[in-house]
């Protein structure tokens, strides 16, 4: 979507100036059928167009959720973070960047409030955390390196991200 596309474009533009390499990773959750197939093909094509390495994987989140006794949303999150952590370890990355934005943050805080979370839950997502075993499904292999999960767009609104995409002629899949 616009968030991930904008983040990838921003990072690829910054990469020549700063000491980091990019590797694009995309997890197909096995939920949205052919639409999700097209999403993964589009991400792979975008990575190739921009000369970036790509790793994609397909999983069956509904089956994982049933087997692990999780909601589909939680199973998808754990599968995604486990996949990103494994790819990061494989390519010897120190960080994984995800495209959560200010609108996602507001939604998270509101959901936590409505569920009766205490003050810690009301703080929302942090801009940087260490990926740990509690982020992954139980069958995720152990990752033997410290990998940070960073959210560079956490203070940026979705409307600003969409404006960025328009300004830079990016056409994200919606």
Task: Report residues per predicted region.
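Core alpha/beta nucleotide-donor-binding catalytic domains of modification enzymes
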Residues: 2-174
């Amino acid at each position: 979507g616009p968030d991930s596309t904008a983040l990838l474009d921003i990072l690829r533009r910054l990469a020549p100036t700063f000491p980091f390499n990019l590797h694009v990773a995309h997890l197909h959750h096995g939920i949205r059928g052919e639409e999700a197939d097209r999403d993964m093909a589009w991400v792979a094509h975008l990575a190739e167009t921009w000369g970036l390495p790509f790793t994609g994987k397909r999983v069956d989140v509904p089956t994982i959720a049933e087997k692990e006794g999780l909601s589909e949303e939680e199973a998808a999150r754990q599968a995604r973070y486990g996949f990103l952590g494994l790819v990061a370890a494989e390519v010897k990355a120190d960080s994984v960047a995800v495209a959560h934005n200010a609108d996602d943050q507001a939604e998270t805080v509101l959901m936590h409030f409505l569920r009766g979370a205490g003050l810690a839950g009301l703080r929302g997502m942090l801009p940087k955390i260490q990926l740990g075993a509690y982020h992954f499904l139980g069958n995720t292999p152990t990752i033997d390196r410290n990998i940070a999960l960073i959210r560079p767009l956490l203070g940026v609104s979705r409307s600003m991200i969409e404006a960025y995409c328009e300004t830079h002629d990016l056409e994200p899949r919606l």
